[in-house]
Amino acid sequence: FVKCNAMNIESLEYAQSVLHEKFGDIDVLINAAGGNQPKATVTDRLLVEDIKLVDWSDAFDLNLVGGALLPCQVFGRLMVEKGSGSIVNIASIAGHIPLSRVVAYSAAKAAVINFTQFLAREWASNGIRVNSITPGFFPAEQNRNLLFEEDGTPTPRAQQILDHTPLNRFGNANELVGAAVFLSSTMASGFVTGT
């Protein structure tokens, strides 16, 4: 592993250099940086029109800039030069359907989806496939209090989300591995781009 800050271009360039030197060509990039900005979440006391620009910016910096834009620029440059590669950006169902009140996160993930589709079209002639995985809701520390009561039962908000989830359950992070492997593999998904 090479530790880097996905929101810092110098850190990404260092990581790319170390990885390229150690392993040679970089064939696959999976961008998984992201998360919610609690100060950009609508509540009964915080309306969308009251969210500060800095909090919107924090959500976009983490999810779009660090979660797709900068890593794609840094690692994509090598892929363009060699004429092949696969990039997988982690998006969110929130980028398609605003099921909860995480407005800045949802907007930023929608931007990730659009950016993914743009790069897929832009880099297709260079032999680079760019896709996104759009997971549903996954319980994590950042949203556990919003989803579960102290006794472990779903909150009304969680139940509302589950009611709009075809499988009627929350996901597990390990369930994304197969999709990432599929989209990374030229043999399995060589004709798939822009998803």
PLM feature spans:
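Substrate-binding pocket helix/loop in short-chain dehydrogenase/reductase
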Residues: 39-48, 52-60, 161
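Active-site loop-to-helix junction immediately N-terminal to the catalytic Tyr of the SDR YXXXK motif
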Residues: 43-46, 98-106, 118, 146
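Alpha-helical segment proximal to the catalytic Tyr-Lys
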Residues: 77, 121-125, 190
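Residue(s) in the substrate-gating loop at a strand-loop-helix junction
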Residues: 92
